Amino acid sequence: MKTRSISFIVLCITLIASCFIINKGIFDAAYAQNNTNIFGTDGNKQSSGHEGLPYLGVNMRGYYTSLPQAREDLKDPFPSNYYESSFKTLSKTDVIDHVRYRFYWESYVRDPVAFIKELEDVAKTADKYGIKVIYDNHQFHTSSWLNVGRGTGFPAYLFNDPVLYKQGSGGTPKSTAAETWWTNWWNRTIKSVNGTDGWTLQEDFLKKIVSTVDKHQSTLGYEILSEPQVHTKDQWTKIGKYNTFMVDALRKLTSKTIIYSMNIPIDLKSPIQVNAENLAKMSPNNKQNIVFKFSLYGIPNDGYQSDKLQLFENASRIAGVPLYIGEWNNVKRVATINEEGKKIWQIEANQSNISQADANMIVEKFKGIGIWGMAYWEWSFVINETPNFNLVDIMYDKATGAGKIQPTKYFEIMTKAYQDVYYQPSERVFPTDSRSTLS
């Protein structure tokens, strides 16, 4: 009798365990099926760079694609062989597979012919050397109209109210003019002088970008708008509507990756309620081949940077889209007072730096959360006063108009970090492509 009871109990436990395993398998399969933009059929995160790893790359700046409307031409000379030499140098590494190429809408308005020609040069040269390109619709301090000294982004014709948007009145999140303008942008009330709304105008501009480069094998995808400003807690869902509008429009022309960006400011104690749930509201309705980009300029070991990284990871899970660290580096910030007398945090160039240990730690943290890709800031012909923002030095030859591009120690630090974290010596079997045949 006792033996029968024991047998019966064992049978019940076995049946319960079997049901649990079956149900868990069904649940996991359904979860993976509903998240095919992040997970493959085996439930693993998509990673499409080298050997199934995340995309590893750099940010790159151009010339005509970054000229502001309200300032003179860039003082640093632009070498005629900039793209040829840059992509060739990048292709000779074992780890760099893409660039995040930033451009500005107002630069297109300033000189559309030169702008488009430069984009075509980028795409053709990237094709030649087997480097992928993400085309990033960038903005910094809103526009050179609002921030004449440093801003670049939206074209001047979208600031046609001289009372609300006085030229030079400030484009940072602390600026009253910027707050008003961005609020109206999310309400879709920003219009040109002929009455066309800003969203439609930007849609037309982005379609020109896609039409120019989408046919190229090197084109990886497009970033809708880098780091838009949020000023009130009701704007999160409005940004979601904006991203949905842009994604739906661009999907008529391309099936390639589309990226939407984090907001600024990222103040975890702000009244705009920066939390994972609100960040997830920015995602578009159509999440097929969609990626969420954020920036991180610090070591996410503890404190604010660690909390920030956790925030974006949580937002990614809620939204059901993978993460792209579109900008990463390490900087020191100090409190300063802006033109309106408000406290802001600015990069202190002399105190900013990144060591090999720092870079390895940052990349290791990114690997730990299972990202789609990352890009170091930055590769540029313009000399930056922040030393670790310079991946290359350029020796310009006035006689020929060309330049000799020499990677700096920071390029070596970045590539070694990628290599140390993602490539073990015994596992480094690289694919055969155009990069492996270069001299």
PLM region spans:
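Sec-dependent N-terminal signal peptides of Gram-positive bacterial secreted proteins and lipoproteins
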Residues: 4-24
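Sec-dependent signal peptide cleavage junction
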Residues: 19-35
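Low-complexity, Pro/Thr/Ser/Gly/Ala-rich linker/spacer regions in secreted
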Residues: 33-48, 426-439
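Active-site mouth of glycoside hydrolases
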Residues: 39-273
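A short acidic, often aromatic-flanked loop/helix-cap motif at beta-alpha or helix-coil junctions
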Residues: 66, 299-301, 382-384
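Extracellular glycoside hydrolase catalytic/binding regions
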Residues: 71, 79, 192-372, 390-394, ...
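Short, loop-centered acidic/histidine patches that primarily coordinate divalent metals
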Residues: 104, 326-329, 377-380
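Aromatic-rich peripheral "rim/lid" segments of glycoside hydrolase catalytic domains that contact
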Residues: 174-175, 179-186, 335-344, 348-439
